[in-house]
Amino acid sequence: MKFELDTTDGRARRGRLIFDRGTVETPAFMPVGTYGTVKGMTPEEVRATGADILLGNTFHLWLRPGEEIMRKHGDLHDFMNWQRPILTDSGGFQVFSLGDIRKITEEGVHFRSPINGEKIFLDPEKSMQIQDALGSDVVMIFDECTPYPATEDEARKSMQMSLRWARRSRDEFDRLENPNSLFGIIQGGVYEDLRDESLKGLVDIGFDGYAVGGLAVGEPKADMHRILEHICPQIPADKPRYLMGVGKPEDLVEGVRRGVDMFDCVMPTRNARNGHLFTSEGVIKIRNARHRDDTSPLDTKCDCYTCKNYSRAYLYHLDRCNEILGARLNTIHNLRYYQMLMEGLRGAIETGTLDAFVADFYTSQGREVPELVD
């Protein structure tokens, strides 16, 4: 992978990630294909929304279908018929989400399979081996996602163990002679000094990119902004910056304003299945009865297949009848909305008009523009 940085506007950055399988324009949003599929969508449909890269999940793909089946197909690209870049999460966050059915030790994580209750062990080495089998273009280190709330001492111990796991991830990645890219993950909770220590340790090890982890786990939005404003300027400028698991459209805007290059989140697809649709004027709840006889498109400013071909009344009808097509059309729209937002942000950075773009975005949503800390 090669990262090119073209221009900046304030702290926002416009560039691209260049892989053998294709180029990813940044800032970029990655749709989530947890089980090797963006729910309800074919790869061609996902690509048509403007997506350059997808996210897959190591933990879930390890449990089902498993490494052996993946290798029989070649890798995850061949298995799911997506011949463009793929980033895979290491499984650390999913293990964190298991709660009481997992035990974390220095060696790794012991847990019971959420599928059949089988006892399983996952460590940095195994995570690297699974991601090697997946053929991930971007591999993430295995880390512990620091919970919120956590005391400074708890966050320090978690972060320092993640640093040791980062070293083990790097060593195993190199032992496997994996030709792809490996990203480190900055931890440390809501404590700036711990974030500093984490980043320094990761830079000393050396990675192809740096992710900010442990945010969007329940902390106030102000804390997320504070940590991003503190840590992003310290990440090496020639490396991509990835904010994991974020988020709402306004979170993407605020992340870009603070120098983030990459995002992922299940929100556009999950919300689509629940009838919550993002538009240029805010969120529309399509199952609301006021849409029952509305012949207008979902969003007149959207160029997606759904908006060009169907009315709000039809989408309401599909939702009320629990038709699968409704979830699919909603997903197409939400993913396209996210990609159009990223396209707008990239264009604004290129032309030095980001402040105006951000002001228009919040005005259309009926909200005030959050302040940046100098």
Swiss-Prot record:
Q: Which GO terms describe its molecular function?
A: metal ion binding; tRNA-guanosine(34) queuine transglycosylase activity
Record-annotated disulphide pairs:
none
Give the region (RNA binding) as residue ranges. 245-251, 269-273
Q: Which UniProt keywords apply?
A: Glycosyltransferase, Metal-binding, Queuosine biosynthesis, Transferase, tRNA processing, Zinc
Query: Any keyword RNA-binding?
Result: no
Q: Which cofactor does it need?
A: Zn(2+)
Query: What pathway does the annotation place this protein in?
Result: tRNA modification; tRNA-queuosine biosynthesis
The UniProt annotation places Zn(2+) binding at 302, 304, 307, 333
**EC number(s) reported in the record:** 2.4.2.29
Active-site residues (renumbered) = 89 (proton acceptor), 264 (nucleophile)
One record GO biological process: tRNA wobble guanine modification
- Residues where substrate binds: 89-93, 143, 187, 214
Cellular component GO terms, alphabetical: cytosol
How the cofactor is bound: the record states: Binds 1 zinc ion per subunit.
Q: Does the keyword Transferase apply?
A: yes
**Reactions accelerated catalytically:** 7-aminomethyl-7-carbaguanine + guanosine(34) in tRNA = 7-aminomethyl-7-carbaguanosine(34) in tRNA + guanine
Protein purpose? Catalyzes the base-exchange of a guanine (G) residue with the queuine precursor 7-aminomethyl-7-deazaguanine (PreQ1) at position 34 (anticodon wobble position) in tRNAs with GU(N) anticodons (tRNA-Asp, -Asn, -His and -Tyr). Catalysis occurs through a double-displacement mechanism. The nucleophile active site attacks the C1' of nucleotide 34 to detach the guanine base from the RNA, forming a covalent enzyme-RNA intermediate. The proton acceptor active site deprotonates the incoming PreQ1, allowing a nucleophilic attack on the C1' of the ribose to form the product.
Concerning HAMAP family, the annotation shows:
Q_tRNA_Tgt
Q: What is this protein called?
A: Queuine tRNA-ribosyltransferase
Origin species, per record, is: Shewanella baltica (strain OS155 / ATCC BAA-1091)
